[in-house]
Amino acid sequence: MNKRAIAGALLLGLSVLLLASCGSVSTLETKAVTQTTASEATAAEEQPYEQYRNATEKIKKPEEQQAEELKKVLQQLNPQYGKADELDFWWVTSPRCIENEAAGKSCIAPMLGILAPSADPVLFIAFNYIGGEYMDMDTVEIHTDEYKYTYSSGTFSMEVQKDKVTFQNSPDKMEETALRLATDDDIDMLVDILKSDEVLLRFEKFNTAKPIWEECTMPEEDKQAIADVLNAYYLYLNASEMARAKAIS
């Protein structure tokens, strides 16, 4: 990913969020699926994002516990510090997303923008296409077990960024990244991905008389990356300012 461009887009998104609320502009279609008659019970412990999303009232924890839990999650994600236009910030994504890029895999890369303990975190989604040549993509489709989500270029937070991925023993590949400021509907989409057995990603160039597209199965590592970033997002969102300060200091 073009880190300088992504960092600039994060700053732009953070500024936009301060000026106005962002509505959902994605499209959602129900797919025809066979209903299952029984659900499998799971003994797995709820992850932080599940606890906070499903909570009917605010979860109260001691400040030190908030700071400790948040710091632990952020350290796993290796936050990057940046500064531009006299505004400093942290941007956070999963190492699994970086590993996918290094392996030449197209993927979804969720990330956080953090300005200061006094400001809530901002969630972004990067759609990352990697191929033999540039596509000039303008549309991304995500197919889960039950739904299809479509994002066109008008819903992106910036122009699609182009970069190159180099390999030691194989030809270079071209990379295109579209970044989107996530809405509540997008968070629902990410959770839907986590619940799906298989997810298909389709990167498209449709604003042309000669459309082209590439599709692939979403890397399994993306699911853990999504869960990790959602955990950090909800832990930060629900922490006190002092707990946030201790976690990022």
Outline where the language-model segments fall.
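C-terminal motif of bacterial Sec signal peptides marking the signal peptidase cleavage site
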Residues: L18-S21
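A generic "folded-domain core" signal
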Residues: G23-S249
